[in-house]
């Protein structure tokens, strides 16, 4: 893999990885809150309020990381386009030119507006409507990332298909990652609560497991479409830097699916049975460990996404 020793723009790759990860996690935490935590904890209003508060705080932190890394990404992108240093890029007004005259800039402005809307909704989080609007804004924030990558430069009907696949891919990834972040929060609250949460935790895990299965199915389907557009052939997958890194990404994703399968087929039933007997410690410990491993693997994938976004698609390199 020559990309390992090539001159990769490390700061840009890392910034993209952090930004993609934080944006996806922001949406994912809100998905987890709305579709998993709140329905599962209806029988424990006090505990539900604590979990919702912590998840909202986590969404705030992730939104700040997303906004900060987005500004850094804009600066790095301006430096790359204009061939300027950081000080010159800021003082010369080149960043405003990028914002006003490029697709990247237009998408950045739209996403900034969505981030402001999301922040406003989080401030009014005690009301139902802002909570729902926050989820939509967060999904828009992560979905619009599709227009910053290769999909944004694919033309015609194929471009529409590419964008749709990218949006689905990003949304499904967000839902999965949100659960990986949200479950430990729920477990931490349960561990320090006097309320008997065994059955409620089991219900939350079951709900997230269902979302996880759907997310994996969407990731595989949309990923196949994206690979068909950007790679095009098995030979291109094997002989190009893009294809080889994509194979590594697929291998890491398959490992994540393996851990998710263990959680779904083994640990979730164990947790449900243990909840009835009150002996769920071992199942919870294994689930927490697997969740942490999946999060580490997810960040590794975002690093690869950061690199892939800087490489020429394989289909353009093999004839």
Residue ranges and their predicted role:
Residues 1-319:
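Polytopic transmembrane helical bundles with strong interfacial aromatic enrichment
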């Amino acid at each position: 893999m020559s990309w390992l020793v090539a001159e990769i723009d490390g700061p840009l790759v890392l910034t993209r990885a952090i930004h993609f990860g934080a944006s996806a996690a922001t949406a994912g935490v809100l998905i987890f809150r709305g579709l998993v935590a709140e329905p599962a904890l209806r029988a424990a209003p006090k505990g539900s309020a604590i979990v919702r508060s912590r998840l909202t705080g986590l969404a705030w932190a992730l939104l700040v990381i997303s906004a900060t890394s987005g500004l850094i990404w804009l600066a790095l992108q301006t430096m790359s386009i204009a061939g300027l240093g950081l000080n010159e890029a800021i003082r010369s007004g080149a960043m405003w030119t990028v914002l006003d005259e490029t697709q990247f800039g237009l998408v950045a402005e739209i996403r900034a507006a969505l981030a402001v809307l999301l922040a406003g909704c989080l401030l009014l989080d005690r009301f139902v409507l802002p909570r729902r609007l926050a989820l939509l804004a967060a999904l828009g924030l992560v979905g619009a990332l599709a227009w910053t990558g290769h999909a944004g430069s694919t033309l015609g009907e194929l471009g529409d298909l590419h964008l749709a696949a990218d949006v689905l891919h990003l949304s499904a990834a967000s839902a999965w990652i949100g659960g990986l972040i949200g479950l430990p929060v729920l477990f931490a609250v349960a561990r320090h609560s006097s309320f008997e949460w065994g059955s409620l935790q089991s219900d939350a895990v079951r709900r997230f497991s269902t979302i996880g299965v759907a997310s994996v199915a969407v990731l595989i389907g949309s990923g196949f479409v994206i690979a068909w557009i950007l790679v095009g052939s098995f030979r291109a997958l094997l002989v190009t830097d893009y294809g080889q890194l994509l194979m590594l990404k697929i291998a890491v994703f398959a490992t994540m699916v393996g851990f998710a399968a263990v959680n779904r087929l083994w640990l979730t039933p164990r947790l449900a049975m243990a909840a009835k007997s009150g002996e769920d410690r071992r199942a919870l410990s294994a689930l927490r460990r697997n969740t942490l491993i999946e999060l580490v693997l997810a960040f590794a994938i975002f690093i690869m996404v950061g690199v892939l976004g800087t490489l020429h698609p394989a289909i353009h390199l093999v004839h």
